[in-house]
């Protein structure tokens, strides 16, 4: 996270524009039993994004953090979620193109209305 963001920022600061989007998970804002390593890494990434947003915003670089609290429709999900078909029928699995549309929206935001953090989850997800 940090190294990728730093390298992207080096190129963007020369151009005085750009967008860096970090992807997190529910663990970015809430720890859970058995998830200490994952949660600490995701919370750390969120802190990196916050710091970079404050540092790079004045240089016209939009830094955002996206929390994905969902199963995204991939082959791995299809193979490993026994209730995949049922969840898919009721919009309980996120479609990758819908996820991508949210990233494009972040990218296209005008500077006077930048979003720092976006939570994406299906309607049925418990939070």
Language-model region placement:
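Amphipathic alpha-helical dimer-interface segment in Rossmann-like NAD(P)H-dependent oxidoreductases
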Residues: 1-14
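Generic structural signal for well-ordered alpha-helical scaffold segments
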Residues: 9, 53, 104-107
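Residue-level signal for alpha-helix termini/capping positions
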Residues: 13-14, 28, 57, 111
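Catalytic loop of short-chain dehydrogenase/reductase
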Residues: 19-44, 49-50, 54-58, 72
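Short beta-loop-alpha junction of Rossmann-like oxidoreductase domains
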Residues: 34, 61, 65-80
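C-terminal helical subdomain
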Residues: 58-61, 65-70, 85-127
């Amino acid at each position: 996270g940090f190294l990728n963001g730093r390298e992207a920022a080096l190129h963007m600061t020369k151009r005085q524009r750009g967008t860096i989007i970090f992807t997190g998970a529910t663990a970015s804002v809430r720890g859970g039993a058995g998830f200490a390593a994952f949660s600490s890494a995701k919370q750390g990434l969120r802190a990196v994004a916050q710091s970079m947003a404050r540092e790079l915003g004045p240089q016209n670089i939009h830094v955002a953090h996206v929390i994905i609290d969902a199963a995204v429709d991939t082959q791995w999900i299809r193979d490993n979620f026994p209730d995949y078909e049922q969840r898919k029928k009721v919009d309980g699995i996120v479609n990758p193109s819908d996820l991508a549309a949210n990233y494009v929206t972040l990218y296209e935001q005008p500077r006077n209305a930048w979003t720092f953090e976006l939570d994406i989850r299906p309607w049925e997800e418990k939070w």
